[in-house]
């Protein structure tokens, strides 16, 4: 059941070093940023070398330096990052995107066009048309595009897939997945405008699917991965359990 780490050995033998990763988003105060940064370097495959750590250029440069990165590689915009890294003998080879949902598609598209491989937090895009465009760009430029569905790497998830694939559980008849979070249970609508979670309730930024794109995609991916089957059609009931929240 357990998989060996031959892939890692081959990677390090081929390159002789970890791959160089730049971060988009995830600066000081980010809820998800430290998770991505820590996970990226956990097994020695990647080394975070810098990035764009905020939509505000000054905050990005200061925030990246505060996190301990070389200020020279703490950029104000993605364009600056691409230009700055191209001029180096040791440029970033991929970017990891951990920004609000509405920026995933334009950042990923620009990074792919710049010749960078991309690891993107979910949801990858707001709609299927954007997703298809990213697929086309990835193929056109010969790059790699990955979505950060990290739960599929958990040993228990891998073991569940193994049980299904080997027929150990018998005929598959029904799959039930629950993914519960309470992060939006408080009325953040009443919080100050600079509250870091307010954007999640704005469909223009979070996407029309709102919470379904934020955490429902995890449930969908876990189900698909564990049973090794693709979803072919969808039907859903959606309700709000917080008063006066659509």
Question: Where are the regions that the model predicts?
Answer:
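Predominantly a Rossmann-like dinucleotide-binding segment in NAD(P)-dependent oxidoreductases
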Residues: 151-245
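N-terminal Rossmann-like dinucleotide-binding module
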Residues: 2-69
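Beta-strand-loop-alpha-helix segment that lines the small-molecule cofactor/substrate pocket
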Residues: 94, 100-153, 167
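Receiver (REC) domain switch-region micro-motif
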Residues: 95-96, 175
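A structured beta-alpha segment of the ubiquitous adenosine-cofactor-binding alpha/beta core
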Residues: 73-93
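Hydrophobic beta-strand scaffold residues
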Residues: 47-48, 74, 118, 145
């Amino acid at each position: 059941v357990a998989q060996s780490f031959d892939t890692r050995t081959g990677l390090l033998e081929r390159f002789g070093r970890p791959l160089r990763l730049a971060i988009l988003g995830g600066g000081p105060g980010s809820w998800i940023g430290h998770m991505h940064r820590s996970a990226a370097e956990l097994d020695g495959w990647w080394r975070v070398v810098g990035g764009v750590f905020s939509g505000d250029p000054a905050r990005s440069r200061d925030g990246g330096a505060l996190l301990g990165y070389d200020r020279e590689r703490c950029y104000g915009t993605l364009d600056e990052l691409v230009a700055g890294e191209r001029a180096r003998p040791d440029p970033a080879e991929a970017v990891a995107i951990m920004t609000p949902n509405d920026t995933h598609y334009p950042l990923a598209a620009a990074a792919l066009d710049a010749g960078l491989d991309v690891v993107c937090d979910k949801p990858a895009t707001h709609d299927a048309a954007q997703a298809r465009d990213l697929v086309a760009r990835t193929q056109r430029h010969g790059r790699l595009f990955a979505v950060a569905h990290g739960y599929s790497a958990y040993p228990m998830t891998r073991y569940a897939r193994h049980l299904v694939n080997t027929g150990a559980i018998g005929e598959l008849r029904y799959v039930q997945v629950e993914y519960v979070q309470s992060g939006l249970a408080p009325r953040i609508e009443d919080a100050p405008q600079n509250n870091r979670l307010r954007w999640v309730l704005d469909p223009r930024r979070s996407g029309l699917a709102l919470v379904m794109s934020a955490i429902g995609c995890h449930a969908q991916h876990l189900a698909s991965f564990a049973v090794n089957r693709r979803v072919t059609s969808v039907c859903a009931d959606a309700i709000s359990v917080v008063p006066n929240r659509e």
